[in-house]
From Swiss-Prot:
It comes from the Bacteria. Pfam families: SpoVG. The keyword Secreted does not apply. PANTHER family: SEPTATION PROTEIN SPOVG-RELATED. One of its GO terms (biological process) is sporulation resulting in formation of a cellular spore. Could be involved in septation. Belongs to the SpoVG family. Keywords: Cell cycle, Cell division, Septation. InterPro entries: SpoVG, SpoVG_sf. The keyword Cell division applies. NCBIfam families: PRK13259.1. This is Putative septation protein SpoVG. HAMAP family: SpoVG.
């Protein structure tokens, strides 16, 4: 399965403490789109968070997620490269790719 398109929607927060940097939509093989991947700045650097929902007991469960670490790394690297391409001023972010 190939990544054929990545769309980044940067979040401009008025709250300087906001950790959410962007929402991402990834297209696979020009036939499947995965929306609402988040780019988040955490204590250990920037990472992606997969779409999730809150359960009745208040836990968050991923709706979809990579099965293997290799694919997660591929997905994250592709998203980070596109994020930096669109936002070159954010090069100082600690991106792991």
């Amino acid at each position: 399965m190939d990544i054929t398109d990545i769309r980044i929607k940067k979040v401009e927060s008025k709250n300087s403490g906001s950790k959410l940097l962007a929402y991402v939509a990834v297209t696979f093989d020009n036939c499947l789109v995965l929306h609402n991947i988040r780019v988040i700045k955490g204590q250990k650097g920037v990472f992606i968070a997969m779409p999730n929902r809150r359960t009745r007991v208040g836990e968050y469960k991923d709706i979809v997620h990579p099965i293997s670490q290799d694919f997660r790394k591929t997905l994250q690297t592709s998203i980070f490269k596109e994020y930096i391409r669109e936002n070159p001023a954010d090069l100082e972010l600690e991106l792991d790719f």
